[in-house]
Amino acid sequence: NWNNVDLEFRLDCLNEMIGVLKDEKIEYSRLMAFEMGKPVSQAESEIDKCIWLCEYYFENASEFLKDKIINDNAQKYIITIQPLGIILGIMPWNFPFWQVFRFAVPTMIAGNTILLKHAPNVLGCAKAIQQIFEESSLPNNCYNNIIITHDQVSLLIKNKSQPS
């Protein structure tokens, strides 16, 4: 279970993803240019932003995820971050890497798994992102693209939110 994997291992996976993003930056930029007409220079900046985000969470996740203790005059409260399970993300087309990474990285670092519906006109980018996650040491099925319609998303949410 991914939610039981320690933070250090999750961060190791994230660090591997940083390496892939850096190594394949030009390829991913060209893919965005091909699929959606984004200028290559803007696409490169988008990948740089994804790298920055990954590095930011790599450096700060331990602090973000540790328990917070709040004292008021009457009581002491502890806020604990806990995984929720499978999180569905529905992404637009205009920033096909950035929108996914800003959602997926903190979601994954917090111990959740991801189902991601990408926009239908950037499915090559969606596939490339899935490969980035798969090339890290993440266990299988921590990140999964789903290719479904908006109507099917409604059915998925309805079916998955029912108590078992």
Segments predicted by a language model, with ranges:
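Rossmann-like NAD(P) dinucleotide-binding subdomain of oxidoreductase/dehydrogenase enzymes
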Residues: 66-164
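N-terminal Rossmann-like NAD(P)+-binding subdomain of aldehyde/semialdehyde dehydrogenases
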Residues: 1-75
